[in-house]
Each structure stands twice: as C-alpha cells, then as structure tokens.
C-alpha cells in the first residue's frame, strides 16, 4: 500500500503549484530519496531539511513544506530512518549517517545557501532534530523539535506499559485515576 501511495503522490506532484523534484542520492549500495521544492523568486534560499516520525512519511508533509516555502526557504522533505523509503533501520546505532548524507548533498547544490541550513523533525523524528542540533551544530543554524518524545518516552518503565496497555490508558490510570 505504501509503494502505491508513493506512486500516486508523485503522479499528483506534477500538478502542484510549486514544482516538486524527486531527489535520489546514492547511499551504501541503496539510495536516499527526498522531495525538493524551491521558493519562487528567491535566489540562494536557505534550506529546511524536514521529516516526520515513525508513521509519518515524506509524502505526508506537504502542509509543512508549503509553510516553509512561504517564508522564502527551500523545503527538502525526507524519511527518517526506519520509515518510508529510508533504507536504514531506526534501531541502527549509526542511523544518523543518513542525515549527514543529506547535509552533504545540500552543499553540492549551488542554488542553495548552504550556510543557512535548518532541520525540523516531527513526532519521533524530533529526536533526530535534537540530536543533530548537537552532532551537526557546526553545519546547521537551527533545529525544530516538533512534538517529540521527552522524559517518559525513552524510559523502559513507561514504554513497556505504553506498548502493552496503550499509552493513553496507562497515563490516564496512573496520573488521573481513570
């Protein structure tokens, strides 16, 4: 179903107001795939590299891409490790290398201002934005942590009940008594 939806999305993209370029970069015998949209009338725009969470694919981020474009920035939408077309598992301890491949790619494109690069991760993808804010601090100017897990979200004492009884149920029972 996912591959069918990607095919339909790319067919629909031919009719988008802002052209969408499918980017494929070689990566460890496979490829990383992203969607680039450029703002109208801006030369050498800054770039926002953005992605969703575990169940949010690059095809789901059109609304965010359109907001980025409104501010005169280029939108480069990708999948986080473990989702969509990203070939690397999110459990791979070195999964961050996919982001570094994208950061390197941006510098190969002369139409971007590679000195003004930001990242934006949503949901579980926010974890990667926060991590890049530290590990790529010399390469990026800003990072958006949009609705990501904090504190309990990474602790076994919370995760086990959340995955066995449902996060909302466990939270409601333990915090609010219902």
Predicted region positions:
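Glycine-rich nucleophile elbow surrounding the catalytic serine of serine-hydrolase chemistry
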Residues: 121-131
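Short beta-strand element of the alpha/beta-hydrolase
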Residues: 44-53
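Conserved alpha/beta-hydrolase
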Residues: 68-85
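Alpha/beta-hydrolase active-site loop
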Residues: 60, 67, 90-112
């Amino acid at each position: 179903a996912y591959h069918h939806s990607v095919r339909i999305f790319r067919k629909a993209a031919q009719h988008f107001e802002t052209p969408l370029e499918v980017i494929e970069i070689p990566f460890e015998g496979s490829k990383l795939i992203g969607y680039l949209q450029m703002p109208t009338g801006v030369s050498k725009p800054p770039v926002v590299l953005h992605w969703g969470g575990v169940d949010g694919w690059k095809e789901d981020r059109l609304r965010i891409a359109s907001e980025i474009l409104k501010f005169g920035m280029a939108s480069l939408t990708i999948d986080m490790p473990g989702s969509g077309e990203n070939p690397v598992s999110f459990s791979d301890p070195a999964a961050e290398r996919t982001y570094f491949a994208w950061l390197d790619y941006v510098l190969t494109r002369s139409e971007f201002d590679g000195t003004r690069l930001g990242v934006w991760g949503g949901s579980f993808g926010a974890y990667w934005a926060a991590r890049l804010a530290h590990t790529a601090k010399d390469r990026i100017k800003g990072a958006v942590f949009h609705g990501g897990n904090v504190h309990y979200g990474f602790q076994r004492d919370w995760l086990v009940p959340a995955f066995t009884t449902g996060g909302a149920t466990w939270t409601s029972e333990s915090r609010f008594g219902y």
